[in-house]
């Protein structure tokens, strides 16, 4: 493995402040290098962080190349310019090229500590498998959703998102910060083991594959007219079958899941997703058997 530099990003969304605090503990000279690998720790969206908001003009994590934001607002939105800067500075062909990007996020949903992957890149599978094997973390595999594109880690040859919640926006939670610190330390250790061929992959990777998203009930004006059903609150990753309640509207009517397939919900009630008209996303569970090629692909970095 020839990885020489790894990018650790916090504050991609400016009001997700816990990973920024955790990263400060690592962004010191003694932590910059580990066994020949240089770690770059940056705040993804510093202006939004200063203002305590998610973004200035557009979601930075939807503003990299191949996104609608990038195509339509290349020269006018702060976030698209920031995305270009990050790629020019830290992209594989940048002035400080990084082979791997790790993007740290929090959520107001009860997701626990989880991994988010975008697509089925073998290098990403390799890194995610090691973390899942060590901590038992659930994996949300997001793919084939044309409404959501341009994610940060997709701009690097290898990368994943660490998502931790539930925690309110702009609220420091020591337990959440400790979880980020543990994950960052473990990632550094696992990458070091990979570099020295001291690792064995688990036999399989369990993923929850994105299938779609569900909006809140709405009235004729388009305003939200229902709440997440009490039985569904804080039940991320818990299976839903036909007939299970999803929402309770203003008339007291229960809106039930009417699909025939079993689904597993994620990001239930995520505050930031209201503007995207998403009350929750739903997934199907899939088991992917590990392949030696994953390690070979990772070693090629």
Swiss-Prot record:
Cofactor binding mode and count: Binds 1 zinc ion per subunit.
Keyword Metal-binding in annotation: yes
Protein name: Probable aspartoacylase
Amino acids binding substrate: 54, 61-62, 163, 273
One Pfam family here: AstE_AspA_cat
Keywords of this entry: Hydrolase, Metal-binding, Zinc
EC code(s) of this entry: 3.5.1.15
Reaction equation(s) it catalyzes: an N-acyl-L-aspartate + H2O = a carboxylate + L-aspartate
Gene3D superfamilies: 2.20.25.160, Zn peptidases (3.40.630.10)
PANTHER family attached to this UniProt entry: ASPARTOACYLASE, SUCCINYLGLUTAMATE DESUCCINYLASE
GO MF terms held by the record: aspartoacylase activity; hydrolase activity, acting on ester bonds; zinc ion binding
Keyword Metal-binding: yes
Cofactor: Zn(2+)
Annotated GO CC locations: cytosol
Enzyme class: hydrolase
Residues the record lists as binding Zn(2+): 13, 16, 105
Family that this chain belongs to: Belongs to the AspA/AstE family. Aspartoacylase subfamily.
InterPro entries the record matches: AspA/AstE_fam, Aspartoacylase, AstE_AspA_cat, Aste_AspA_hybrid_dom
